Swiss-Prot record:
It comes from Phleum pratense. The modification Phosphothreonine is found at T111. This is Profilin-2. Keywords: Actin-binding, Allergen, Cytoplasm, Cytoskeleton, Disulfide bond, Phosphoprotein. A motif (Involved in PIP2 interaction) lies at residues 81-97. Pfam families: Profilin (PF00235). Disulfide bonds join C13-C115.
Amino acid sequence: MSWQTYVDEHLMCEIEGHHLASAAILGHDGTVWAQSADFPQFKPEEITGIMKDFDEPGHLAPTGMFVAGAKYMVIQGEPGAVIRGKKGAGGITIKKTGQALVVGIYDEPMTPGQCNMVVERLGDYLVEQGM
């Protein structure tokens, strides 16, 4: 299965009538493996900060997490595995696997829990596959 298929069929799937605003699978260096049509472009320093937070949980908490220049308040995730952020009525979930970052961005009416489920389910599957 191609990386784009994972984005199109697994991350952008419909859940209770809603779906993510955008999603992507990136390499740890920020290289885009696949993305939805309107996924925002990460800046290199944003990826560096996100990867540092996975290595040093709490690194982003004081400053917030930036994605394409937009600031997200970092909320409770899973240290070293999942970073979650909130911005207005929406937010972001990032799941780290051995080789990739699985990213989902949502807006209402999708809920944070629905976003977490979609992103973390695919991330857990990729971890099981050695990715």
